[in-house]
Amino acid sequence: MRQHLFSLDVLQVQQGTGSGFVWDTTGHIVTNFHVIDGGDSFRVRLADQSEHAAKVVGYAADKDLAVLRINAPPANLTPLPLGVSQRLLVGQTVLAVGNPFGLDHSLTVGVVSALGRELRSPGGRKIYDVIQTDAAINPGNSGGPLLDSNGRLIGVNSAIYSPSGASAGIGFAIPVDVVKRLVPQLIARRRPVVPGIGIIALPESIAERNQLEGVVVQEVAAGSPAARAGLEGLRRARGGGFYVGDRIVAVNGKRVQSLDDLTHVFEQQGVGAIVELTVMRGGERRTIKMPLVAVE
């Protein structure tokens, strides 16, 4: 299977193989969602060559992350120390570890080529703040760790840009700050906690076609923070057609142009945070504060 541009299903040499890393001594293993997507059963081979049956604990398709669990002696499980992706610098040395082309426990060295890239996840949403590296990432590396020179986890190798299907010096990793936030949620409740305000947004294609800036509110859930704050969705006009709903154009002073942008800011703030929305209703601009709650 080949998908070249920002491929999340990179060319596979061995069907259904990928990489991962130990999260804790209770047997949790982190990998990419696209590595386990569609699989019925899974086995994990550790560095000591022991193999273990694995079960899926949880996953976040929108972030291309998944957590498995194996039953192995704690003495055989060495979790990776965690770094901080916000502190990364372009030019910093990084190491990619994985199983390229089925070659177990391979390590390649490179640098951080760029920060703040965006990728499309298997779930269709944007992944923000992605790390670009020239460390060789090949088929089979997906789900493996990207480390700094001190051996701390700074990202999860997820994708490559390649006309040929092999490494072209442009690889991408999900930042560890996202991993640190999501993995405990996946372990605790199988799915990520999604912060929101209780709205359904108008599809972006319709908003763009009508040259509507920001996130257009289509519906507001009853009893939600958005409803309590008085946000309005689309309304049917008497003569047919609709009145445009409120448009969210900024959150905490940061401009948002899409639902992905809005969700990203909400995720950074977290459930329980108070956010300040800049809303356009007709030609009037207003500022509204409301709390973020967990939404499905």
Segments from the language model and where they lie:
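Serine-dependent protease modules
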Residues: 1-212, 219-222, 240, 259-263, ...
